Swiss-Prot record:
It comes from Methylobacterium nodulans (strain LMG 21967 / CNCM I-2342 / ORS 2060). It is found in: Cell inner membrane. This is NADH-quinone oxidoreductase subunit N. Keywords: Cell inner membrane, Cell membrane, Membrane, NAD, Quinone, Translocase, Transmembrane, Transmembrane helix, Transport, Ubiquinone. NDH-1 is composed of 14 different subunits. Subunits NuoA, H, J, K, L, M, N constitute the membrane sector of the complex. GO terms for cellular component: plasma membrane. The keyword Transmembrane applies. GO terms for molecular function: NADH dehydrogenase (ubiquinone) activity; NADH:ubiquinone reductase (non-electrogenic) activity; quinone binding. It catalyses: a quinone + NADH + 5 H(+)(in) = a quinol + NAD(+) + 4 H(+)(out). The chain crosses the membrane at residues 10-30, 44-64, 77-97, 113-133, 166-186, 206-226, 243-265, 277-296, 302-322, 328-348, 374-394, 397-417, 451-471.
Amino acid sequence: MNAAEIVMPALGPALPELILTVGALVLILYGALRGERSTEGVTVGAIIVLIVALFSVVSQPLGAKITTFNGSFIVDGFARVMKTLTLVGSLAALLLARDLFARERIERFEYPILIVLSSIGMLIMASANDLIGLYLGLELQSLAAYVIASFHRDDVRSTEAGLKYFVLGALSSGMLLYGASLVYGFTGSVSFPGIVTALREAHAGLGLVLGIVFVAAGVAFKLAAVPFHMWTPDVYEGAPTPVTAFFASAPKMAAMAMTVRVFIGAFPGVVAEWQQIIVFIAIASMALGSFAAIGQRNLKRLMAYSSIGNVGYALIGLAAGTEEGVRGVVVYMAIYLAMTLGAFAVILGMRRGNRMFETIEDLSGLSRTHPWLAFCLAMMMFSLAGIPPLAGFFAKFYVFAAAIKAGLNVLAVIGVVTSVVGAYYYVRIVKIMYFDDAQAAYEPLAPGLRIVLAASSVVVVLFWIVPAPLVAAAGTAARSLF
């Protein structure tokens, strides 16, 4: 057996990552040769690369499980579903940014390349089967994200957002690494199957529990979950709106995939030890997300607290520690992706001339100037509030049902109560759009915004008619972890 026979089979399962890597390198060369004139070409090229990578993920058999790179990289049903959601989020983020950057003459070809590079890290996070691979994917995603956050370098708010994100991100990476070192020290392995085997043969000591706590702290930062959420409102508000839309979508999918993979894949035998940590994070995130958003006037800041609360609801499914719980997490994240992208498509459409608007009051009377836009945003808000028969209701139903089945009745009740509280600020937005005095009309939506908003609206409004495909895919993803 020659070297080619050894290496080439190992590359097959990582085909989506390879496509993105080669595509990013080609786009960098093209951009460097053409300069700022290449911005449109690089953007279109990045969209094509993401579509090809998405096709390569979708075309893989959903039920198969393959490991490669000495077991550090796994491709199973869970990885495929979460990679699909991640790439959809990245694609939508590029579509949302394309028209705005062209209008504001932000002619920098690096942005779409950074999205592609960040996507490589996110796909690795979803397929990581050991702590080292997980950290490498996480850092690749984060390094690109730090630059993206401060991409509008002439804007003080954008620069401040990038700096805050970088400093706190470096702190969280250190905590994750320290936790990983403790886990390795007390189990003798960094691979998830090796950790599982070690925990079968020995009791989980205090050192291992401490390691799990630090790992949980590291992943909680990437999820923007309480108490490691402090960067989220400022970064969401300060970053350019297309960047905020990206942060609220694709990285959330990858971070949740990483979190589920770590706790279900590496620590299934010590559920009692980490379940309490996840329950605390879920309750704190739901409570803060619901109450802190009530007084917000800036839509991007409100969406930041909304994302914190939604992460808390998704973590209810993980806290259950069961197959039904993981299925609920996958369904929740898929629907959350649609709701968030739809909401940001409307926010990006709030434009008159060269001025962008992003406060809640700027939505006054939107139903009279842009009835279709108001209807779509109202559906997103009602869905985020969990009002039936919209998709958001079913997302919460699946995670609450999993929690009750696992005996976490108090957690489910707290989830319902915080949902009722959170409904206030979602319904307030609808009230402002339909009952307040109208302002001057905004400009027509750009084509990219229309595509994202239409697709999101279809998912949110019509999910109850055909829920089977998503639920079945989520079920297959969950079974691959158990």
